[in-house]
């Protein structure tokens, strides 16, 4: 092969490798990125962004998270603050269909608050019990709750763990 042909072949192989690496990286991107982007798009003009972490199945902590969300909506107004509650581990109990706090969750959702449900936790429950309990249909599934918190904080959200 002549010198120009080798050069063209090298360039072609380099481009194929670069495109393959880009495609592989895109395929490996976490699905929570899509959820995070949807969260950021929900209230693009919000002056404040808050993520509330709930990882405990404690009625007092659940009530506190709900109270914080209500109080911030009242203080800033629903158009001025974006609030996302990320539940994982035992904290997903707040989003069960039979939760005693369901009416409060639904009310907050109606005011623009997002409630994220960690699918890693749901998968663990399914593996251990053989079934998935019913969850509030307003819950937004995310692949990993902690990864969702990280993505949100990297995009301007302030993390609060009441």
Predicted regions and their residues:
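Bacterial N-terminal signal peptides
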Residues: 10-20
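Secreted/extracellular ectodomain signature
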Residues: 25-162
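N-terminal twin-arginine translocation
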Residues: 4-5, 21-24
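Bacterial N-terminal signal peptides that target proteins for export
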Residues: 1-12
């Amino acid at each position: 092969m002549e010198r120009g042909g080798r050069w063209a072949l090298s360039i072609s192989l380099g481009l194929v490798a670069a495109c393959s690496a880009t495609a592989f990286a895109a395929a490996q991107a976490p699905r929570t990125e899509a959820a995070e982007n949807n969260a950021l798009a929900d209230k693009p003009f919000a002056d404040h962004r808050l993520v509330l972490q709930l990882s405990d199945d404690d009625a007092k902590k659940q009530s506190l998270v709900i109270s914080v969300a209500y109080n911030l909506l009242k203080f800033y107004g629903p158009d001025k603050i974006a609030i996302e509650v990320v539940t994982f581990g035992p904290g997903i109990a707040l989003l069960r269909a039979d939760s005693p706090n369901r009416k409060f969750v639904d009310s907050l959702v109606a005011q623009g608050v997002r409630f994220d449900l960690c699918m890693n936790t749901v998968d663990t429950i399914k593996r251990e019990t053989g079934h998935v309990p019913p969850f509030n249909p307003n819950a937004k599934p995310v692949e990993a709750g902690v990864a969702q918190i990280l993505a949100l904080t990297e995009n301007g959200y302030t993390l609060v763990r009441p």
